[in-house]
UniProtKB/Swiss-Prot annotation:
Pathway: Secondary metabolite biosynthesis; flavonoid biosynthesis. SUPFAM superfamilies: Cytochrome P450. Its cofactor is heme. This is Cytochrome P450 93G2. One of its GO terms (molecular function) is heme binding. Its main location: membrane. It is found in: Membrane.
Amino acid sequence: MEEGVVGGGGAAVLVALLVTVVLAVMRSAGSRSSKRGRLPPSPMALPIIGHLHLIRPPPHRAFDRILARHGPLVYLRLGPSTHCVVIGSADVARDFLKFEASIPERPPTAVTRQLAYGKAGFAFAPYGAYWRFVKRLCMSELLGPRTVELLRPVRAAELADVLRAAQSAAERGEGVDMSHELVRMANNSIMRMVASALPGEMAEAARDCAKQVAELVGAFNAEDFVAVCRGWDLQGIGRRTNEVHARFDALLETIIEAKEEARRRSLRLGRRESSSKDLLDMLMDAAEDDTAEVKLTRDNIKAFVLDIFTAGSDTTATTVEWMLAELVNHPECMAKLRGELDAVVGRSRLVGEQDVARLPYLQAVLKETLRLRPPAVFAQRVTVEPVQVRGYTIPTDTQVFFNIFSIGRDATYWDQPLHFRPDRFLPDGAGATVDPKGQHPQLMPFGSGRRACPGMGLAMQAVPAFLAALVQCFDWAPPPSQPLPLDMEEAAGLVSARKHPLLLLPTPRIQPLPSFYS
């Protein structure tokens, strides 16, 4: 009897203590909430993991589902302490971009810290003197109009290899893996623009490294969201990152040493001319400039080359592949583009980058593909101070995801947003004045503002020309075993590529191919 009384008293004390703790936690949470202000709508979170269980790959699709249910601005907690907001409409994106000074940087991850030599590169460099210097270097020299034009023959030569591969496949009556051919073309083009005298075996090694870099950067890594996982490498991502970084670093060191020797030899012979410079030459010139406001280090050069190679090659190949796949699925659009090419360019010569400005339907196909199938499906920033937007307070150190995939399908701006309709971008279409270079939030495949992709000028010139040549020279159809429409499922990763290889049968339209490419 006495034991029952004592036990009952102990239970009462325990309950009282638990109630006190719960009330204290609630008061503390309320106090923190009042300090940080009102947050955007949010799905129900789980203890510890927050909303991680909702982010199934590919993440842009998961974000899109959440946005469809909770509105165009959503708060998520990924893990115990990683706070995020996701933007899914052009209007909300426009409101956020008014506070660009408050979201100037990209949040680094465990993988990018290692691969990008800390923050030595351009993509993840903090906003400041170094970032501004490299941005100017990019826009005026490395990826400026003069350099893009100067390196046009490099891109033309790589396109020639793709056309020859398609011609050979057609002669054998076989299909061609366009996914493989386009990745090879884009990677080789970028690497030869970076270092013109690159041996074939180095290009192959660089291509393999770039593929693994894209996989690692795009992979979910628990260490980025759950602090107790840091240092344990439970997924093996850290080990793989170290291995890829070591391989890429050794490759870059070999390329740089070869370039240094070539520059010394040219200088001795008096052959050093600006017209023959590639991007690596330009970076080395900047590093050797004693009057420059920022001194580039060897790690800066390596990180920058890595940025250009990984960002430029996969996105180029992916965009051309999506364009070609959409045209195969929409024969009426393919016929319209082919008619434009025949009328403007003809069949006596190959269409080139210089023709793009005179081909409005080609430009419309590119814009519609970038709207519906953006290769970079979200842009990521982090707040450096609280941001007041739409009645909500976004706290400092909150990751901001512009879900470009959802924004491009915003029904407020686009009629039938899930349909492939290039005509919307023709002069009499609703999107005639919409430009994809970041001025119109409803179409921002290259991001917007100071962190927009510096290579957009190159992309807008080279990508449509690649596609135009393929359409001008060949008819394309899937193998008999693969009926239309083509499967358009996306793969998870840093770049939103097609999940399955694009296998097509080419039939020559121009025989022989134009002499410049024969």
